[in-house]
Amino acid sequence: MAFHLLNLFLSAGTSSEAATSSAVGMIGSFLAAGALIVAPAAAALIWVSQKDALSR
C-alpha cells in the first residue's frame, strides 16, 4: 500500500520549481514567526524576570 502511494505521489508531475517556491515560503514563514512572536515574547520574559529578581 505504501509503495503504491509513493509511486502515485512521484508520478503526480510536481515540479521542482513549485517545491522550491513552497520551501522558500515555509522558511520565510518561520522567520516571520520568529521576528513577530518569539523574539518579543522572549524579550518580555527576560525583562520581567530581571525586574522581579529574588533577594537572597
UniProtKB/Swiss-Prot annotation:
GO BP terms in the entry: photosynthesis
Transmembrane segments: 27-47
Keyword Thylakoid: yes
InterPro entries assigned to the protein according to its UniProt record, in alphabetical order: PSII_PsbX (IPR009518), PSII_PsbX_type_2_subfam (IPR023428)
Pfam families reported for this sequence: PsbX
Signal sequence bounds: none
Family: Belongs to the PsbX family. Type 2 subfamily.
Protein's name according to its UniProt entry: Photosystem II reaction center X protein
Organism: Prochlorococcus marinus (strain NATL2A)
